[in-house]
Amino acid sequence: MVKLAAKCILAGDPTVGKTALAQLFRSDGAHFQKNYTLTTGVDLVVKTVPVPDTGDSVELFIFDSAGKELFSEMLDKLWESPNVLCLVYDVTNEQSFTNCSKWLEKARSQIPGTTLPGVLVGNKTDLAGRRVVDVAQAQAWALGQGLECFETSVKEMENYEAPFHYLAKQFHHLYREKLEVFQALV
């Protein structure tokens, strides 16, 4: 049984639900943050995720970073060497989706020339009447960027675990590939 540790960057614009998503995931659905508070730096959420059919697990160190541009300079150091990326946007806010390109570019610049497994998460699907970002549009963009696409409603506690389980599985897969290469060299 192997226990791996992965640094996960949680990125996206303010008010898209990054903190609520991380907190709900950490608490296994027991805690939904009803009052909004602006993240002004980085909150760290740690949770161990079992990798199916392996007996192994990945401890995700989720860096929940401020979505405000003015805070982004101080985050550069904290964003160094990420292992996985979770981009979050609000399905009712077109600009938050558009800005995912900026967040992705920033994250990838931290590890040039290296694969960064990632997911694109459309949050607030409970606000279906106000939706402006189409599922197909998000899926097409994610596919073009090499990301897996998910939708969730943190408020309704729907599908909030799936992105993190996917990231843990992808990180474990990369570990197994590197291990096989190393063993072939020995």
UniProtKB/Swiss-Prot annotation:
Q: Does the keyword Cytoplasm apply?
A: yes
Keywords, in A-Z order: Cell projection, Cilium, Cytoplasm, Differentiation, Flagellum, GTP-binding, Nucleotide-binding, Protein transport, Spermatogenesis, Transport
As one GO molecular function, the record gives:
GTPase activity
Query: One short Pfam family name for this protein?
Result: Ras
Does this entry carry the keyword Iron-sulfur?
A: no
An example of a Gene Ontology cellular component annotation for this protein is: Golgi apparatus
Q: Fetch the InterPro entries from UniProt.
A: P-loop_NTPase, Rab_GTPases_membrane_traffic, RabL4_euk, Small_GTP-bd, Small_GTPase
The UniProt entry, under SUPFAM superfamilies, shows: P-loop containing nucleoside triphosphate hydrolases
Query: CDD domains in the record, alphabetically?
Result: RabL4
Organism superkingdom? Eukaryota
User: Which residues are GTP-binding?
Assistant: 12-19, 64-68, 123-126
Compartments it resides in: Cell projection, Cilium; Cytoplasm; Cell projection, Cilium, Flagellum
Q: Primary place of residence?
A: other
**Which GO biological-process labels does this protein carry?**
cell differentiation; intracellular protein transport; intraciliary transport; kidney development; smoothened signaling pathway; spermatogenesis; vesicle-mediated transport
Its annotated function is as follows: Small GTPase-like component of the intraflagellar transport (IFT) complex B that promotes the exit of the BBSome complex from cilia via its interaction with ARL6. Not involved in entry of the BBSome complex into cilium. Prevents aggregation of GTP-free ARL6. Required for hedgehog signaling. Forms a subcomplex within the IFT complex B with IFT25. Its role in intraflagellar transport is mainly seen in tissues rich in ciliated cells such as kidney and testis. Essential for male fertility, spermiogenesis and sperm flagella formation. Plays a role in the early development of the kidney.
State the NCBIfam families in the record: small_GTP
- State the family it belongs to: Belongs to the small GTPase superfamily. Rab family.
Protein name in the entry: Intraflagellar transport protein 27 homolog
What are the leading ranks of the lineage? Eukaryota, Metazoa, Chordata, Craniata, Vertebrata
